[in-house]
Amino acid sequence: MTKPPIGGNRTGRKLGQKVKKGKLKASSRRWLERHINDPYVQRAKLEGYRARAAFKLLEIDEKHNILKGARRIIDLGAAPGSWSQIAANVTGSTDSDIRVAAIDFLEMTQLPGVKILQLDFLDPQAPALLMEAVGGVPDVVISDMAAPTTGHQKTDHIRTMHLCEVAAYFAVEVLAEGGHFLAKTFQGGTEKDLLNMLKQNFKQVIHIKPASSRQESVEMFLLAKGFKGRRSGNALGHEVEDDGPMPHDPREDATADEDQD
């Protein structure tokens, strides 16, 4: 499902193209060449996804079965919207029955079946607005949030891990029992306190680096499966429609003991 085309792509464009020097800086030219020759970029265009990141989510789902049966999904750091496209398709979300809420401080072009909030997720109002937008208790919270890079690896790691941590605590506050949480992190280790919190609240916690992540990238994904539920209801303190526990996928049993952290 997520393997890139071999020896080219199905659009007829050959890979390995060079970009003329012109007025571009060497670093910009290298980035552009890498982008136009990336088979996942080509495939995203062919299959109608807004970004190559779609294949990261599809690849993770193919192995770990986190989307099947999901009735409502919240997408954090959603721009340009490829994960939201997948979420809308999985949930059957429509403009008349919204089941996907997406948030990003960057502007996003509208997507059918997706309620988009142009807002920083760290805004204190964001959690309540997301829950209002999604129309009920989500089965899955996905986050592709990353802080703007500074070029200093330790600083970038700390800033992105803060976003991951905030997203994780939000997921624990809002997820349906049996739900799943997926978030971007960086190589260099997830903070012990965050891992311990997730292990207390989910049945399985693993790190993943999908093949569709660029080889030179330090990004990884933190997946927490099987939310155990809250003892005292929704921690955000407002009424939402509860569809009950997320339907169990028997395929999860086959991977329950894999790659435990």
Curated annotation (Swiss-Prot):
Enzyme class, broadest EC rank: transferase
InterPro entries, per database record: RNA_methyltr_RlmE, RNA_MeTrfase_FtsJ_dom, rRNA-MeTfrase_E, SAM-dependent_MTases_sf
Keyword Coiled coil set for record: no
GO cellular component terms listed in the entry, alphabetical order: cytoplasm
SUPFAM superfamilies: S-adenosyl-L-methionine-dependent methyltransferases
Compartments, as annotated in UniProt: Cytoplasm
Annotated positions binding S-adenosyl-L-methionine: 81, 83, 104, 120, 144
UniProt keyword annotation of rRNA processing present: yes
Active site location: 184
EC nos: 2.1.1.166
Catalysed reaction, written as an equation: uridine(2552) in 23S rRNA + S-adenosyl-L-methionine = 2'-O-methyluridine(2552) in 23S rRNA + S-adenosyl-L-homocysteine + H(+)
Ranges of compositional bias, category Basic and acidic residues: 245-254
Chain intervals for the UniProt region annotation (Disordered): 233-261
Protein keywords: Cytoplasm, Methyltransferase, rRNA processing, S-adenosyl-L-methionine, Transferase
Gene Ontology molecular function: any one: rRNA (uridine-2'-O-)-methyltransferase activity
PANTHER family noted in UniProt: RIBOSOMAL RNA METHYLTRANSFERASE, RRNA METHYLTRANSFERASE 2, MITOCHONDRIAL
Family membership noted in the UniProt record: Belongs to the class I-like SAM-binding methyltransferase superfamily. RNA methyltransferase RlmE family.
Function comment: Specifically methylates the uridine in position 2552 of 23S rRNA at the 2'-O position of the ribose in the fully assembled 50S ribosomal subunit.
Record-given protein name: Ribosomal RNA large subunit methyltransferase E
Gene name of the record: rlmE
